Design a protein with these regions (language model features):
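Extreme N-terminal starter segment of soluble prokaryotic enzymes
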Residues: 1-6
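N-terminal phosphate-binding loop and adjacent alpha-helix
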Residues: 8-28
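Residue-level recognition of beta-strand->loop/alpha-helix junctions
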Residues: 8-10, 41, 111
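Catalytic metal-binding/acid-base residues of hydrolase active sites
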Residues: 10, 44, 85-86
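Active-site beta-strand/loop signature of hydrolases that rely on acidic residues for catalysis
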Residues: 19, 27-57, 73, 80-81
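A short acidic, glycine-rich active-site loop
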Residues: 56-67, 125-126
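A short, hydrophobic beta-strand-centered structural micro-motif
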Residues: 62-88
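Active-site catalytic loop in hydrolytic enzyme cores
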Residues: 88-126
C-alpha cells in the first residue's frame, strides 16, 4: 500500500519562510505513516500574490524552494511533487511544478503552458 500525503493549507502571501516551515510541520506530523509521495499545492511558497511571484522566483537551476524540497525529501525519505512555484529562466518567469525523488534529486519539472488569465488572475502576463 502506498502512503500519500496531500497538503492543504493557506499560505501567507509573500512570506516564503513561514510557508516553508508550515510545509515542514505538516509533513513532520504525518512522517510516521511511511509516506511514498507528498503532494504540495500550487503557490505554496508565496501564496497567490503577483509581487511575490515576480520578486522571489526560483533560479532555473534550483533556488531556495527547490533546496528546501530536496532536503525535505531526503529527511522524510519520500517523493515530492510541489504544485508550482515561480521560476526564472533568463528574463522569463514561469509557473513551474517540481518533482523530487527520495534522494532529494530534482527528477522533473513542468512549466504551465495554459496560464490563468480570467477572474482576475494574471499568470499570462509573465
Amino acid at each position: 500500500m502506498a502512503g500519500v500525503l496531500s497538503l492543504q493549507f493557506t499560505p501567507k502571501s509573500g512570506d516564503k519562510q513561514f510557508n516553508l516551515q508550515k510545509v515542514n510541520e505538516i509533513i513532520s506530523e504525518y512522517s510516521d505513516k511511511k509516506l511514498d509521495l507528498v503532494v504540495i499545492p500550487e503557490f505554496f511558497s508565496t501564496g497567490i500574490c503577483d509581487d511575490a511571484f515576480i520578486n522571489s522566483p526560483e533560479d532555473v537551476n534550483g533556488g531556495e524552494v527547490v533546496k528546501f524540497l530536496s532536503e525535505t525529501a531526503r529527511k522524510y525519505n519520500t517523493n515530492i511533487v510541489c504544485g508550482t512555484a515561480s521560476e526564472r529562466d533568463g528574463e522569463k518567469l514561469f509557473n513551474t511544478a517540481f518533482v523530487l525523488n527520495r534522494s532529494g534529486e530534482l527528477i522533473g519539472k513542468y512549466r504551465k503552458i495554459h496560464l490563468y488569465n480570467f477572474f482576475g488572475g494574471n499568470e499570462g502576463t509573465y
